[in-house]
Curated annotation (Swiss-Prot):
SUPFAM superfamilies cross-referenced by the UniProt entry: Helical backbone' metal receptor
GO cellular component terms given for this protein: periplasmic space
Cytoplasm recorded as keyword: no
Record site feature (Important for BtuC binding), residues: E79, E209
Role: Part of the ABC transporter complex BtuCDF involved in vitamin B12 import. Binds vitamin B12 and delivers it to the periplasmic surface of BtuC.
Organism classification: Bacteria, Pseudomonadati, Pseudomonadota, Gammaproteobacteria, Enterobacterales
Organism of derivation: Yersinia pseudotuberculosis serotype O:3 (strain YPIII)
Alphabetical GO biological process terms: cobalamin transport
PROSITE patterns according to UniProt: FE_B12_PBP
Assembly description: The complex is composed of two ATP-binding proteins (BtuD), two transmembrane proteins (BtuC) and a solute-binding protein (BtuF).
Regions annotated as coiled coil: none
InterPro entries, per the entry: ABC_transptr_periplasmic_BD (IPR002491), ABC_transptr_vit_B12-bd (IPR023544), Vit_B12_bind_prot (IPR054828), Vitamin_B12-ABC_binding (IPR051030)
Identification of the protein by name: Vitamin B12-binding protein
Fe/B12 periplasmic-binding domain location: 30-277
Length: 280
């Protein structure tokens, strides 16, 4: 058989072909999502109408708020999940406890795991979900649009002068992100340089002194303007740099909406004057 790659196809035709190749014998009919991010992925992939239950804080889109909750920070309600008879469970590998998931898998329930550490993996998850969706073309189109948006941001901000960026999560204790997280990738996408990218653990706890020695030029947090005020006050008087607050749900969820946070960050980073080169 001639490899498909030898004959370039129009984009729309390629998406349709992928949809046909990945269409399962029977799409999922009863889906349960165990995290807010996988709930958003389900809707983006055309599985929203098939959701029968979700996790706490699954609040986007609006229709997700009407669904029953079977998971929270306290754990997973295995008994209730079994009563709902799902034929697909969407799980967050980094956030859901593994033991109840193993129990559910042992009973023959298919489990789709999502835990992207690279921004392009969100598009890959959408492509993979197409095999379970009654509308696989919607999943592939969402993945393609996501990739296009990422590439647009990369092209637009690739030549930006890097700004040393501190990703701040909390104050007491003070946590940040290594270079192996989605949040760090968003910073890089916008021309930022994560000052703790070299950390060996994904979410290191750091001291005030360690942050100061790395001389950040901008601080990025998730939250509202009040968070900006609190963080600015926390660092005074030793550190006076711009603080950018990003929509918490956009920035912290591994879903297509993370690109809204990226756009928000890129625009604000670009408006910050590049500091005069420091003498060494």
């Amino acid at each position: 058989m001639m490899p498909l790659g030898l004959f370039p196809l129009p984009r729309a035709a390629a998406v349709l072909l992928i949809s046909l190749l990945t269409l399962p014998a029977q799409a999922a009919e009863r889906v349960i999502s165990l995290s807010p991010s996988t709930t958003e992925l389900a809707y983006a992939a055309g599985l929203g109408d098939k959701l029968v239950a979700v996790s706490a804080y699954s609040d986007y889109p609006e229709s997700a708020k009407k669904l029953e909750h079977v998971a929270s920070w306290q754990g997973i309600n295995v008994e209730r999940i079994l009563a709902l008879k799902p034929d697909l469970i969407l799980a967050w590998r980094g956030g859901n406890p593994q033991r109840p998931l193993d129990q559910l898998a042992a009973l023959g329930i298919p489990i789709f795991y999502s835990d992207p550490t690279h921004i392009d993996q969100i598009a890959s998850d959408l492509d993979k979900l197409a095999q379970y969706s009654p509308h696989p073309e919607q999943a592939h189109q969402a993945a393609e649009q996501f990739r296009q948006h990422v590439n647009t941001l990369r092209d637009r901000y690739a030549r930006s002068q890097p700004k040393r960026t501190f990703l701040q999560f909390g104050t007491q204790p003070l946590f940040t992100s290594s270079g192996h997280t989605l949040q760090s990738e968003v910073v890089s996408l916008c021309g930022g340089e994560n000052i703790f990218a070299d950390s060996r653990v994904p979410w290191p706890q750091v001291s005030r002194e360690r942050v100061m020695t790395r001389k950040p030029q901008v601080i990025v947090v998730s939250g509202t303007q009040s968070q900006v005020d609190n963080v600015s006050a926390f660092w005074l008087p030793q550190l006076v740099v711009p603080v950018i607050a990003l929509n918490e749900d956009w920035f912290n969820r591994a879903s297509p909406r993370i690109l809204l946070a990226a756009q928000q960050l890129c625009q604000q980073m670009a408006s910050i004057p590049t500091p005069v080169a420091e003498s060494h």
